[in-house]
């Protein structure tokens, strides 16, 4: 093929792109996970709730293992100080299959997410798009998922407040752009009340 390598946003708490990464790996391509710590929910400074949910592991360590065990070739660390490299160095050869204990922790994390969000969980299938008003429905509901399921309030508020102010690399329209036209409703396979959820966001 033409490509030998790709970079993707791959995160423990937002695994929507992992199937694409696995396809690339199956095709013999290298895959780099972009900012699995910071953009994945600022896992280097997790909420107490997320810390409790991931026990006995730190959320960042579990996130790195999740990606490495899937075969992801490279993780960008984004260190702000030398000590931030300690965890990465300790996990440099931790690319084997998940242990039963790690699998249990990941399953528990997913179960807790589903319990907390219930029938309002957005599965990030993107069937709701395109929105006539260009509201980035999946991204906004992803932030909602992270806030309510894992109490990542500081991270989600920061990301939301960057909408329309970050240039080409982030969204331009926030939830206020929704005019409740209902165009997205029949396309959602989970029957989410999308305009209502956006209003909460």
Locations of the language-model features?
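Beta/alpha (TIM)-barrel catalytic core signal, keyed to glycine-rich beta->alpha loops juxtaposed to Asp/Glu
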Residues: 1-144, 149-163, 168-170, 196
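Iron-sulfur-cluster electron-transfer modules
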Residues: 169-183, 191-195
